[in-house]
UniProtKB/Swiss-Prot annotation:
Keyword Signal: yes
Name the UniProt record assigns to this protein: Uncharacterized protein RP296
Organism: Rickettsia prowazekii (strain Madrid E)
Segment forming the signal sequence: 1-19
InterPro entries listed in its UniProt record: DUF2608 (IPR022565)
Keywords, in A-Z order: Signal
Entry annotated with the keyword Signal: yes
Superkingdom per UniProt: Bacteria
Length: 274
């Protein structure tokens, strides 16, 4: 009986140790107590990866808001069409480059700078989809959007500002001025490849994302290696106020589908005399 108790105690200790070593934590704001409690653990031994779309930035138009929005699946609808008709990817690419973008929270600027000042390597993480490949110099385009919003990641890795993970593979992930672009592989494999090419692996990794599945996939890999992991499931985008006006949203969708021209909310409102 004593031996059984010792075994159970050992297993419990392992569970507790694992739970403290690998965590996925939800938060609704970068100003939350969760983030404030995390910050003391962010230092020169930490790699921070931040998902970009609907985590750091999001479209300005209320057509893409999360709350009370009957039009939330407009982009998903386009991607579903592209699954059977690759030419639709050109239409999606037009939408991507025409939409005006904004920060989900202005406090992202200070948080990123603070983590960098504490010695962490702070990088953006951007998934590459088929429409992205149709945008000329997509990496430069996204960097310019973020720079214009005062988002500045750690600019160099391996003393380089720009490089492809595998120079002989034209579809391999790219590091571009602080942003990792996934290329033709998923985010987990991109992280695996990134850890292979940096000279000293981090002791801790912090990942911000609005997709829990991404965080769980990262966790599945990082639990097998000797790296502490904090996954931050970020709901900031879902908390943005406002919902689309039906007439404006209908005009935006019909105009874009018929002409390829995207109308921002204020432009569409003027056309409707609103």
């Amino acid at each position: 009986m004593k031996r059984i108790n010792k075994v159970l105690l050992s297993l419990l200790c392992l569970v507790i140790a694992y739970a403290g070593y690998s965590q996925i934590i939800p938060t609704y704001s970068v100003d939350s107590v969760t983030i404030q409690n995390l910050l003391p653990n962010v230092d020169e031994d930490t790699l921070v990866l931040i998902n970009i779309d609907n985590t750091i930035i999001t479209p300005k138009s209320k057509l893409f808001r999360y709350q009370d929005n009957a039009y939330i699946n407009f982009t998903k609808y386009l991607y579903s069409l592209a699954a059977n008709n690759a030419s639709v990817n050109k239409t999606i690419a037009k939408l991507i480059v025409q939409r005006q973008m904004m920060l989900v929270e202005s406090q992202w600027v200070d948080l990123i700078n603070k983590m960098k000042n504490q010695g962490a390597t702070v990088l953006g993480l951007q998934e590459i989809t088929a429409p992205c490949n149709l945008i000329e110099n997509y990496e430069r385009w996204l960097y310019t959007i973020l720079y214009g919003l005062n988002i500045n990641f750690t600019r160099k890795v391996n003393d380089k500002e720009v490089f492809r993970f595998n120079p002989s593979d034209a579809e391999a992930p790219i590091f571009y001025l602080g942003i990792i672009f996934t290329g033709n592989i998923n985010k987990v494999n991109t992280l695996i490849e990134f850890l292979k090419i940096i000279p000293i692996p981090p002791k801790k990794i912090v990942i911000f994302a609005n997709n829990k599945k991404d965080l769980e996939n990262m966790d599945s890999y990082l639990s097998m290696v000797d790296i502490g992991y904090y996954g931050i499931e970020y709901f900031g985008w879902q908390m943005l106020p406002g919902s689309p006006d039906n007439q404006i949203a209908e005009l935006q969708q019909s105009t874009f589908l018929n002409t390829g021209q995207w109308l921002e909310d204020d432009t569409a409102a003027k056309m409707l005399n609103k």
